[in-house]
Design a protein with these regions (language model features):
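Alpha-helical segment of the N-proximal tetratricopeptide repeat
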Residues: 14-47, 54, 60-69, 91-98
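Conserved structural position within tetratricopeptide repeats
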Residues: 40-43, 76, 110-114
């Protein structure tokens, strides 16, 4: 049994290579390839928070409801660094803004300010929402 797991366990190096390829595809504006690679990564490694974040961010434009689900799922993760929590909440705020749910976008941005009272992005985003 252990031999089977060891032999078929996803290689961390392979996952990181795929992640770098996905980031490169994003830089080259190959959204389709980036989404495919990121999807492959999260299927192999459900703990790869950065891959989930980037996948949701890429999906926001064409499939914002799916982006919301991905980013919501990340909010329940325990023991994340403060910076990662802020990044997740920011992405979720932008997702809600994309679908026109300004109240939920505001709530998520306010959560950012609860974590970091001087967060410039959250303050600017809340001002932008108030002006809509």
């Amino acid at each position: 049994m252990w031999l089977f797991y060891f032999y078929f366990k996803p290689s961390r190096k392979n996952i990181e290579t795929n992640y770098m390829d996905a980031l490169n595809a994003m830089l080259m504006a190959d959204k389709r390839k980036a989404i495919a690679l990121l999807s492959k990564i999260v299927k192999k490694d459900s703990e790869h928070i950065n891959a989930y974040l980037q996948l949701g961010n890429l999906l926001r434009e064409d499939d914002p409801d799916r982006a919301i689900k991905i980013h919501q799922m990340l909010t329940v993760r325990q023991n994340l660094p403060k910076e990662k929590k802020i990044e997740i909440l920011k992405s979720l705020s932008l997702d809600y803004d994309k679908v026109g749910d300004l109240e939920k976008a505001k709530i998520e941005a306010e959560k950012v300010l609860k974590i970091d009272k001087s967060n410039h992005w959250a303050s600017s985003f809340l001002l932008m929402i108030a002006e809509k």
